[in-house]
Amino acid sequence: MNEWTPIAKKYDPLKAGSIDGTDEEPHDRAVLRAMLSRYVPNKGVTGDPHLTLFVSRLSPQTTEEKLKEVFSRYGDIKRIRLVRDFITGFSKGYAFIEYKQENAIMKAHRDANKLVIDQREVFVDFELERNLKGWIPRRFGGGFGGKKESGQLRFGGRDRPFRKPINLPVFPHQFNSESRGEKRHRSRSRDRSHDWRGQRRDYGRDRDRGIRRPEKERPYTKDDKEQNAEHTKRERSREQAKNDKDKEKKDSKRERSRERDYRKHRSDEHNR
């Protein structure tokens, strides 16, 4: 627990679907399937992974031309790869779109998610296969959480910081060490740390609203365990409901911050 960070340094399917990244047991069969899977990234894939967008939940009728028509509104496209079945040639329902400029991919990531194309609401995120060590695709049970309707603890599917665990104390030296460590994370980690700091403040408010700590030591009973489990369940439900309510309001501000920090990060890399 002391090594908890809001940003995943490598992909762990057990923690990927968790709200706070502290789960110790798989909560559904998809997570278990991902834990047992072994995925080797395609080394034949070309292009800049930091300028590549992942688009899924596409209609079988959606073509490369349709994708170009829709996504070219955000900027100049360098390459589109609609993944097809090797035997039948039919679309597998997902594609990769590489842009020429950083501001184009940031704009598409911000505005194109949940866009309706050919009567299907699509899912859009940055490519993670070449950017996150140990990545397991959703078709093998991986990814970052499914739909809310599927009962996932951490739904939405997009790469984002974990919520701070309610039983994790915060000390100044830990905060400083975490901040220094985040600077060494993969591309786009800085902007996600801003979200973590905001969520830290949310955690403080939740704690003020009712988390009580024992005044003195006493034996830990079965009733205590059941009460703690029920309390944790209520807190998770409350945070999940609050996250739903605030998501739309925070998205715009979050993406603007992401775009500024990501552009600065890429500029620093080019100057090295």
UniProtKB/Swiss-Prot annotation:
GO terms for molecular function: mRNA binding; snRNA binding. Residues 51-129 form the RRM domain. The keyword Iron-sulfur does not apply. GO terms for cellular component: precatalytic spliceosome; U12-type spliceosomal complex. InterPro entries: Nucleotide-bd_a/b_plait_sf, RBD_domain_sf, RRM_dom, snRNP35_RRM, U1_U11-U12_snRNP_70-35kDa. Residues 221-258 form a coiled coil. It comes from the Eukaryota. Keywords: Coiled coil, Nucleus, RNA-binding. Residues 146-162, 190-272 have a biased composition (Basic and acidic residues). GO terms for biological process: mRNA splicing, via spliceosome. It is found in: Nucleus. Residues 146-272 are annotated as: Disordered. This is U11/U12 small nuclear ribonucleoprotein 35 kDa protein. It comes from Xenopus laevis (African clawed frog). The gene is snrnp35.
